């Protein structure tokens, strides 16, 4: 029987972590271990440990990194597969893990990631964006798909993603330093090695963000900076085409839904994303004061 562990980085956890742990509690497949890498012990509450047995490792904020922190968790796991999750992801039903792990019966599958959905509180644009990025159809991706899918071939999200430990180790593990995109960098590596990345649409979590225009700018600045930092990977493909298709499809959806009044918001937010991304790709040429003003993850750029 396949063994699996869960790795959850946390920072100032609250009710959302309780919801996640309760969601794990009702799963038909239960993890062997739950490793929580918590940033700053003073923000941790012992009540989190009453829902399920968890292994908690506390780190300083200055030591947190999207790659290195998950790498630490992966090194703690001795299971066949480990699943990375974020503290604000919530299982949609009791079959999240059983559905997410089912592709690993194929030994060529290295990674499987879950579908992200919204709840009734989400706005129309965010809901459609999640449906665009996480459709109701499975997808098996290999290096052959890079020609037709571009950067989307490497798309993967550690909001909820499972990794075959043996292939992960063979690929060298997560990068130790990155503002984010450790998941896509790993997907690119395993595809280059000849393995598959699977999107499982029936493995579902509730996860979304209603970002302001400024937050969209800052998040995409970090995205651009990540693409610049690992240009040897990301320069192989273009991301502009995919972004343009999202804007076009969202606008058409809003018109068909009779919500044309949201189109100005879509335009302004999309412009903020594009400008942020382009500036992020030049982060190493900008004054540090501007980088710290533009970025979302300020500790990373200090």
Task: List each language-model region with its residue ranges.
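Glycine-rich, basic loop-to-helix element that forms the pyrophosphate-binding segment
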Residues: 60-77
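Conserved donor NDP-sugar-binding/catalytic core segment of glycosyltransferases
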Residues: 90, 94-127
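Non-catalytic, C-terminal membrane-associated alpha-helical segments of glycosyltransferases
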Residues: 222-225, 229, 236-302
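Short, well-formed alpha-helical segments that are part of the catalytic scaffolds
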Residues: 13-26
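Acidic donor-binding loop at a coil-to-helix junction in glycosyltransferase catalytic cores
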Residues: 180-186
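Short aromatic/hydrophobic "clamp" motif used to bind/position activated sugar donors
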Residues: 82
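Short beta-strand/loop segment that forms part of the nucleotide-sugar
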Residues: 21, 32-41, 57-59
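A recurrent flexible, glycine/aromatic-enriched loop bordering the glycosyltransferase active site
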Residues: 143-163, 179
